């Protein structure tokens, strides 16, 4: 897209005056939690170096210590341009830092943030000066199962499908100069039926500047051709408007609206300019897509057409950097290889991925289910932390067209008694309706896999390894499964008190075939040791799922091996275990009721 800058962290809201703060930082463990008392933010006492944004547990950090350290400190100098400070604010951004992040600049406290997966930002304008400034960060983390932790272990060793913990900064740290009168955010909602885009602007300005001389101009273009331009008055902090994006052009060149699909992921550029008293004071580059995702009875429609989803579970782990992508190129490689395997989408599992990943999914046409990292205990504190961060994530990633489904919870993790316990059921309902209050256009699957309460799609997890058994289970016992008379995978499809209401049904986890050449690691079912055995089982169960007439999609587990879990289609270095064209042919083979839409 026109606004694209390599390695820029916030790909949907781009300013050019920024600095990447990744690289070598001073670092230290504070196992006695003495740093604040000893004022490390004034005189740093850490004795190590770390390569940010990689956590100390990883090889790429330069430390590679997998033991638990609950209190850690970072330090570096930052250079600030005093001339730019005259008309700008200086903002520090942390794309991801787990879990409690505290920031000091030049020894003065700048603020804190709780949560590990959403972006946090600090306006430190009043704490910096021209030239070199001291930036100090403390991060507190723990094995507390009440906090959202996703696939991070909460004991000292890996177990099951839980892996080495991620402590501290694990995504890009960066700074930008933001004009004092500026665009704080833009929420973009496509209206395909009316060929329009709804824009909701948030303006950052002093009250005295919110006058009739403050304007926002949006310019929409498609592949270099200007489609629409609109200027609106911005004399209040929240401004809503709608812009028509149908292109009429000259006679013979009309093409109306270009829609976004996995096959043709057409995107529009949109540029924003804020003017005050006739002078441009802020510019932001972005993009959007005209696409509609909605539920129609048992079908999921993309732009009004039935969508069959061929998804793969993607946990976003790398051998030497764990949750942190080693580079932007690694993100692109994953997307390209997932496409090569014949999938049109992915379920980003228990992780909010780097926003650059979402950018490339937008550009390359990869469907995404966005999922929250789970907590593993139900308490008032867990409810508060989960809800707060989930709302931050939905708002942060709302504009990405690749995201077609929100999935706050998985397999009753954090709500382990949801089948019968009303308070846990109420929590999932609250999360569902809160998500809907922010986003009316996307389906929400509150508890993926089983024990659903309110949900726009009913999803089922089943790791049966015999295709015929799998097929018969969901054709001969469909009604009993959906009325909970028969449990699938030992679990009820719906929680007590809830009924199936005709929603679309997807097998959103299956497969997980363990395949490597030694006896280490694990997967689901009996392990296979040869390529031929793997292909036979993969074909058997995938074909069985696709033949289920009412099932409108599937999600195979998983993209790559993750530490002790060896059930990926690739190993941790992203080498294919089986020729991708073989997997692609099986995935894309048209069978059963859905063959028209596959």
Predicted features by range, described:
Residues 186-187, 271-338, 443-445, 589, ...:
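N-terminal carbohydrate-binding accessory modules
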Residues 126-132, 202-294:
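Extended acidic/polar, glycine-enriched regions
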Residues 197-222, 300-369:
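Conserved, compact domain cores that house catalytic/ligand-binding motifs in diverse enzymes
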Residues 177-209, 590-598:
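Surface beta-strand/loop "capping" patches
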Residues 66-72, 80-88, 120, 263-266, ...:
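Aromatic- and glycine-enriched glycan-recognition loops and surfaces
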Residues 7-12, 26-32, 64-183, 225, ...:
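Accessory beta-strand-rich segments of carbohydrate-active enzymes
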Residues 335, 345-574, 582-587, 593-598:
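Substrate-binding/catalytic cleft of secreted carbohydrate-active enzymes
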Residues 1-62, 138, 142-147, 223-225, ...:
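Accessory carbohydrate-binding/adhesion or oligomerization-edge regions at the termini
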């Amino acid at each position: 897209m026109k606004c694209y800058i390599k390695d820029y962290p916030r790909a949907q809201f781009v300013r050019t005056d920024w600095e990447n703060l990744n690289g070598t930082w001073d670092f230290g463990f504070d196992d006695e939690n003495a740093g604040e008392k000893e004022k490390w933010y004034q005189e740093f006492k850490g004795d190590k170096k770390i390569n940010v944004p990689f956590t100390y547990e990883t090889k790429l950090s330069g430390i590679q210590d997998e033991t638990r350290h609950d209190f850690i400190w970072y330090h570096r100098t930052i250079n600030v341009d005093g001339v730019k400070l005259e008309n700008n604010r200086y903002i520090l951004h942390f794309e991801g830092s787990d879990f409690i992040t505290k920031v000091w600049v030049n020894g003065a406290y700048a603020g804190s943030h709780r949560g590990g997966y959403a972006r946090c930002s600090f306006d430190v304008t009043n704490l910096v000066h021209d030239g070199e400034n001291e930036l100090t960060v403390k991060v507190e983390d723990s094995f507390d199962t009440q906090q959202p932790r996703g696939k991070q272990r909460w004991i000292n060793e890996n177990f099951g499908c839980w892996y080495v913990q991620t402590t501290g900064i694990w995504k890009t740290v960066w700074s930008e100069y933001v004009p004092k009168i500026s665009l704080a955010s833009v929420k973009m909602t496509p209206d395909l039926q009316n060929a329009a885009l709804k824009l909701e602007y948030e303006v950052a300005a002093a009250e005295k500047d919110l006058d009739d001389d403050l304007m926002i101009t949006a310019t929409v273009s498609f592949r270099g051709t200007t489609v629409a331009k609109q200027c609106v008055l911005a004399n209040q902090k929240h401004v809503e408007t709608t812009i028509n994006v149908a292109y009429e052009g000259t006679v013979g060149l009309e093409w109306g609206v270009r829609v976004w699909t996995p096959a043709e992921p057409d995107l529009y550029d949109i540029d924003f300019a804020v003017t005050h008293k006739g002078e441009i004071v802020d510019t932001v580059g972005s993009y959007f897509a005209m696409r509609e995702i909605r539920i129609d009875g048992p079908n999921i429609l993309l732009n009004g057409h039935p969508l069959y989803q061929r998804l793969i579970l993607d946990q976003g782990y790398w051998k030497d950097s764990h949750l942190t992508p080693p580079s932007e190129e690694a993100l692109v490689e994953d997307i390209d290889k997932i496409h090569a395997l014949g999938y049109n989408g992915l379920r980003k599992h228990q992780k909010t991925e780097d926003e650059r990943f979402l950018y490339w999914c937008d550009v390359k046409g990869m469907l995404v289910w966005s999922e929250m990292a789970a907590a593993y205990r139900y308490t008032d504190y867990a409810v508060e932390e989960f809800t707060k961060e989930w709302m931050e994530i939905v708002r942060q990633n709302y504009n990405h067209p690749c995201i077609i489904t929100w999935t706050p919870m998985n397999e009753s993790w954090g709500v382990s008694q949801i089948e019968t316990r009303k308070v846990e059921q109420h929590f999932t309902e609250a999360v569902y309706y809160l998500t809907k209050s922010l986003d009316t256009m996307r389906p929400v699957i509150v508890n993926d896999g089983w024990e659903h309460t309110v949900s726009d799609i009913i999803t089922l997890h089943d790791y049966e390894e015999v295709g015929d058994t799998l097929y018969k289970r969901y054709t001969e016992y469909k009604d009993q499964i959906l009325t909970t008379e028969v449990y699938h995978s030992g679990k009820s499809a719906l929680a007590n008190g809830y009924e199936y209401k005709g929603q679309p049904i997807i097998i959103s986890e299956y497969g997980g075939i363990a395949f490597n050449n030694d006896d280490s690691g694990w997967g689901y079912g009996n392990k296979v040791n040869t390529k031929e055995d793997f292909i036979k089982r993969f074909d058997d169960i995938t074909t069985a799922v696709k033949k289920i007439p009412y099932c409108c999609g599937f999600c195979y587990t998983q993209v790559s091996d993750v530490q002790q879990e060896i059930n990926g289609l690739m190993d941790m270095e992203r080498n294919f275990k089986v020729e991708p064209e073989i997997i692609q042919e099986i995935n894309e083979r048209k069978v059963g009721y859905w063959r028209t839409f596959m």
